[in-house]
């Protein structure tokens, strides 16, 4: 029997249930802005050494929770574990982004592609189970654990480009010239992501997020066909957790503000939004069908404490103006910068919690 949750605020917000305050976690909360993360990474020898060791992955997942009163933990891993398991030869050169030795570019490459055997990703599922155990303190689990994956389209971008890209020329050329090949890659990726997230859930993930980092690079109409349709498949394929309820699913398309209505129709429980989106309008557009997660500009954290507090309040007030504070998970609009001063995050966390409590008290007194 798993330990009861000491703090289930995040899961309640995902299900649009009342909460005493607005919960928060941060994309890339276990990362290079923390000196303790850098020390662990140095011991691991490399990024992949860190990500592929359940013990190290557990250590770095817990580091931000020991420093800040965050309301969720997120598995420390990388979105490219899935294409790596497909045999594409992932590497990370020092100071450079990811590289695949065998990019998927020809008809033969696509024909050779298949959904990986999840046993090759056992190190991820072992990490999930180990993190769940490590989160238990005095017989109770401190906060819920989020699992995640890249979206089928975002994974395809790296697989076809062979790494990161400024303009996605290679992958978009394939999409327009050979949509049949692109759909084949996306079908395989969607099934792989479903299997991967369900295995994380079986190991103990209590919510999952699909990171569609590059969906916003697509034209309107193309996004719906080549990214959103496959994320909808993923949402449909997610199964129930230990309590019999389907584990909540968060979809996050960076630059996806244009498509919130369509994203809400996938059946996802929550949508992540970046800082270009007004949360009050986002609530109106999604008509209360989903929780919303976001959406502070990460660079606000380079400002003085008073400016950070003012921007936190603006985000919370924008959301509350749409009809109360419930159903909101505070986050950044994208991953936290490695150059962020750790003390700025303390200011952020304290302000989110204290001001969101104050907003609820004020709403009750006016109610």
Swiss-Prot record:
Report the InterPro entries cross-referenced here: UROD/MetE-like_sf, Uroporphyrinogen_deCO2ase_HemE, Uroporphyrinogen_deCOase
Q: What does this protein do?
A: Catalyzes the decarboxylation of four acetate groups of uroporphyrinogen-III to yield coproporphyrinogen-III.
Q: How does it assemble?
A: Homodimer.
Spell out the family assignment given in the record's similarity comment.
Belongs to the uroporphyrinogen decarboxylase family.
GO CC, alphabetical: cytosol
Stretches assigned to coiled coil: none
Amino-acid positions noted as binding substrate in the UniProt annotation, renumbered to this chain: 28-32, 78, 158, 213, 334
Q: Does the keyword Lyase apply?
A: yes
Per the UniProt record, which EC number(s) apply here? 4.1.1.37
What is the protein name given in its UniProt record?
A: Uroporphyrinogen decarboxylase
Biological or metabolic pathway of the protein: Porphyrin-containing compound metabolism; protoporphyrin-IX biosynthesis; coproporphyrinogen-III from 5-aminolevulinate: step 4/4
Give the source lineage, highest ranks first: Bacteria, Pseudomonadati, Pseudomonadota, Betaproteobacteria, Burkholderiales
Instruction: Respond yes or no to whether keyword NADP is given for this record.
Output: no
Write down the HAMAP family for this protein, in alphabetical order.
URO_D (MF_00218)
One Pfam family in the UniProt entry: URO-D
Instruction: Spell out the residues of the site Transition state stabilizer.
Output: 78
């Amino acid at each position: 029997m798993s330990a009861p949750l000491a703090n289930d605020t995040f899961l309640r917000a995902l299900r649009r249930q009342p909460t005493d305050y607005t919960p928060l976690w941060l994309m890339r909360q276990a990362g290079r802005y923390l000196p303790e993360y850098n020390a662990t990474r140095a011991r691991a020898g490399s990024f992949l050494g860190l990500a592929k060791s359940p013990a190290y992955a557990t250590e770095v997942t817990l580091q931000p929770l020991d420093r800040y009163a965050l309301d969720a933990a997120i598995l420390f891993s990388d979105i490219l574990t899935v294409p790596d398991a497909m045999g594409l030869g992932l590497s990370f050169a020092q100071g450079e982004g990811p590289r695949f030795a065998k990019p998927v570019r020809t008809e033969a490459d696509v024909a050779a592609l298949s959904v990986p055997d999840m046993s090759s990703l056992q190190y991820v599922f072992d990490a999930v189970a180990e993190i769940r155990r490590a989160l238990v303190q005095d017989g109770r689990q401190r906060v819920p654990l989020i699992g995640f994956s890249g979206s089928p389209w975002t994974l395809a971008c790296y697989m076809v480009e062979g790494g990161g890209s400024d303009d996605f020329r290679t992958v978009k050329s394939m999409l327009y010239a050979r949509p049949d090949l692109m759909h084949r890659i996306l079908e395989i990726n969607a099934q792989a992501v479903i299997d991967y997230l369900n295995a994380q859930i079986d190991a103990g993930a209590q919510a999952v997020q699909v990171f569609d980092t590059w969906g916003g690079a697509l034209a309107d109409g193309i996004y719906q066909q080549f990214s959103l349709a496959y994320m909808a498949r993923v949402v449909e394929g997610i199964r129930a957790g230990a309590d019999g309820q389907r584990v909540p699913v968060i979809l996050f398309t960076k630059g996806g503000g244009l498509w919130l209505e369509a994203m809400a129709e996938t059946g996802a429980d929550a949508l992540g939004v970046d800082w270009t989106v007004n949360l009050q309008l986002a609530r109106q557009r999604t008509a209360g069908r989903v929780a919303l997660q976001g959406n502070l500009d990460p660079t606000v954290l380079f400002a003085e404490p008073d400016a950070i507090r003012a921007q936190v309040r603006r985000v919370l007030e924008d959301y509350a103006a749409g009809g109360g504070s419930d159903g909101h998970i505070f986050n950044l609009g994208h991953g936290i910068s490695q150059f962020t001063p750790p003390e700025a995050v303390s200011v952020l966390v304290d302000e989110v919690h204290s001001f969101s409590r104050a907003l609820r008290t004020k709403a009750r007194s006016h109610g």
